[in-house]
Amino acid sequence: MWRLLATLSCLLVLTSARSSLYFPPLSDELVNFVNKQNTTWKAGHNFYNVDLSYVKKLCGAILGGPKLPQRDAFAADVVLPESFDAREQWPNCPTIKEIRDQGSCGSCWAFGAVEAISDRICIHSNGRVNVEVSAEDMLTCCGGECGDGCNGGFPSGAWNFWTKKGLVSGGLYNSHVGCRPYSIPPCEHHVNGSRPPCTGEGDTPKCSKTCEPGYSPSYKEDKHFGCSSYSVANNEKEIMAEIYKNGPVEGAFSVYSDFLLYKSGVYQHVSGEIMGGHAIRILGWGVENGTPYWLVGNSWNTDWGDNGFFKILRGQDHCGIESEIVAGMPCTHQY
C-alpha cells in the first residue's frame, strides 16, 4: 500500500513539474522538451532573430468578442467523410492553396476572413470568379466594428463588414494584383534572408478608397459583397458540415509559445506561456496516426510550419479552436 502511495506521489510530482517547467519562447530548450514528450507533433525553429514583441503582435485576434447570429444546424443531414481537404475538393480555386503573410501587424483577424471569403467566392461561383480579396481593404477601412487594426480585431466584425460595405480585390505585398494589394512587407524570420527584420512595431495603414494606379475598374465598382455572415456552433460535426458544404471558415484560438515551433504532425499544447489569440482559416480535417485533426492555413508565410499550414487536435475544442468559428455566403448574383 505504501509503495503504491509512494509511486502515486512520484507521478503527481512529475506531472506537476512538467506543467510548471518554464522554457523561454523560441528556445532550443522548448524545442527539445516538446520533442522528448513523444507527442503527436514535432517542434523546430520557425523564427530566428525576431523580437518576442513581434511574435505576440502576430496574435491579433481578440477572443470572446461580439458574436454573429448562429446559423441553423444541418450536420445531421450530411454524410461526412473521414477526411476532407478543400484544396482537393475545389482544385480550380487557387486561393485555397495560397498562404499569405500578415507582416509586422496583428491583422490575422482580417487575413483569416479574406482568405476564406476569397475561397468561397470561387466555390460558389463554380470557379468562374477567382479573386484575391484585399486584406488591406479589410484591415484599414473596417474601423471600430472590427477592433483596432494592427493592434488586434474581431473575426465577427470582419465578416459583418463584408456584408455591409463589401471588399475590393488585392493580392500579396508588392504583387500589384487587384485594387488594393497588401502594403505591409513580409519580414525576415530567418538569419540570412533578404526581407526586413521582424519587429513588434507597425502602425495600421490608412484607409484609401482608391485603387492603385493603372488598375480598373474603380474602387467602388471592384467591391465584392457578402449576402450573409454567421457563427457556427461549437460542435465538431457542424463545423465539418459547414466546410464540406460551403468551403473554408475562419476560426480563432489561444496561442501558446510551443505552437510557434510547430513543424509537422497534429498540434496539441504541451508547454509554454500564452501569447494571445490568433485567427486562421480552417480548410479540412482528417485523422493522423489515430489522432483527429483540423487542417488549417496560417498567415505567417510558407516558411512557417508545414509550408504555412498546420494540423491541430479536432473534437475537443483544443485551445478554443472550435468556439470562435465564423463564415458567410457571397452574393453570387453580382457575377
From Swiss-Prot:
User: CDD domains, per this entry?
Assistant: Peptidase_C1A_CathepsinB
Tissue localization of expression is: Expressed in myoblasts, the myotube, fibroblasts and fetal muscle (at protein level). Expressed in the spleen (at protein level).
Q: Which GO terms describe its biological process?
A: proteolysis involved in protein catabolic process
**Pro-region residues?**
18-79, 333-335
Compartments it resides in = Lysosome; Melanosome; Secreted, Extracellular space; Apical cell membrane
Listed PROSITE patterns: THIOL_PROTEASE_ASN, THIOL_PROTEASE_CYS, THIOL_PROTEASE_HIS
Which SUPFAM superfamilies does this entry report, sorted A to Z? Answer: Cysteine proteinases (SSF54001)
Q: Name one Pfam family in it.
A: Propeptide_C1
Q: Which residues are named in the active-site annotation?
A: 108, 278, 298
Q: How does it sit in the membrane?
A: Peripheral membrane protein
**Where are the N6-acetyllysine residues found in this chain?**
220
Which PANTHER family does UniProt cross-reference here? CYSTEINE PROTEASE FAMILY C1-RELATED (PTHR12411)
The protein's name in its UniProt record? Cathepsin B
Look up and give the organism this protein is from.
Bos taurus (Bovine)
